[in-house]
Amino acid sequence: MPFLGQDWRSPGWSWMKTEDGWKRCDAWSQELEGENSQCDIGHGIILNSEDEEIFSNEEHEFASKKRKKDHFRNDTNTQCFYRENWIYVHKESTRERHGYCTLGEAFNRLDFSSAIQDIRRFNYVVRLLQLIAKSQLTSLSGVAQKNYFNILDKIVQKVLGDHQNPRLIKDLLQDLSSTLCILIRGVGKSVLVGNINIWICRLETVLRWQQQLQNLQMTEVDSGLTLSDLPVHMLSNILYRFSDGWDIVTLGQVTPTLSALSEDRQLWKKLCQYHFGEKQFCRHLILSEKGHVEWKLMYFALQKHYPTKEQYGDTLHFCRHCSILFWKDSGHPCTAADPDSCFTPVSPQHFIDLFKY
């Protein structure tokens, strides 16, 4: 399928339809196909082993090369996809670039489907999907919405398989189901892409995922070291590594020793100081009967009023020089003299704000 590229002077791209949507074919496969088409123009008949004896050595060699190219093309044509891990964020039309970049286009181009397999990017993608579910779901195109739910399906199946991060996905599905209920009940008040029955099916799918996660049973490891075998100081060190209070509470329910360590006032004080400032402490100060600060209660009280710091292993970055959004590990073709000075980390909320016009 021919498609006009980003530059109006380009010859255009070749695309192929797959399960994840339309994917652009690699440039070298197009050149190979072009060579084969040129060969077809000069020879309109099919050569077989019996006919080759009639032709000269030059024609025999040409026919042999042609068959090898045809065989190579058939073996590799389904694998020669090209996907850039960056996208140019333009907000206005120019002679070279028509239109502007949308949230849905960026969502499709940045390959979030592969990012969820990277443990460093998993939490980042989940948080982004959650923010989209809360406020930006209807702004996505039909293809982007389909891609959104395909990625979500892969995330749910991954969690059901490896039993990691179920709480994050439960929170995401809860927000998504609430949004879908509001959209379905208020049909006609907002513009929905697709038939209303599609949205009802999506809600039913989300409810089914929630039920599957609710029935998820953690398998106990029979062999090897467990948390109970570790010394107390190491268990305390593990708790101090957490940046989420709910993770500390959940881990404290495993053993009596961890329960005692999870109530450490110094632990919750460090957590409050990491996420919040002194002015916020003064506004929501909670004291015990003895006059001590209840840091654990303060953390959950402050969490209701202020956003906590977000921490991710790998995030998207924005290049101010090139106006390109990209994964830090993947990089992009930057033309700046000092590229590192032009890079800015992009939080999930900042990612969405980039496409608000």
UniProtKB/Swiss-Prot annotation:
It comes from Bos taurus. Part of a SCF (SKP1-cullin-F-box) protein ligase complex consisting of FBXO25, SKP1, CUL1 and RBX1. Interacts directly with SKP1 and CUL1. Interacts (via C-terminus) with beta-actin (via N-terminus). Residues 225-273 form the F-box domain. Substrate-recognition component of the SCF (SKP1-CUL1-F-box protein)-type E3 ubiquitin ligase complex. May play a role in accumulation of expanded polyglutamine (polyQ) protein huntingtin (HTT). It is found in: Nucleus. This is F-box only protein 25. Signal peptide: none annotated. Its main location: nucleus. SUPFAM superfamilies: F-box domain. Gene3D superfamilies: 1.20.1280.50. The F-box is necessary for the interaction with SKP1. Keywords: Actin-binding, Nucleus, Ubl conjugation pathway. InterPro entries: F-box-like_dom_sf, FBX25/32. GO terms for biological process: protein ubiquitination.
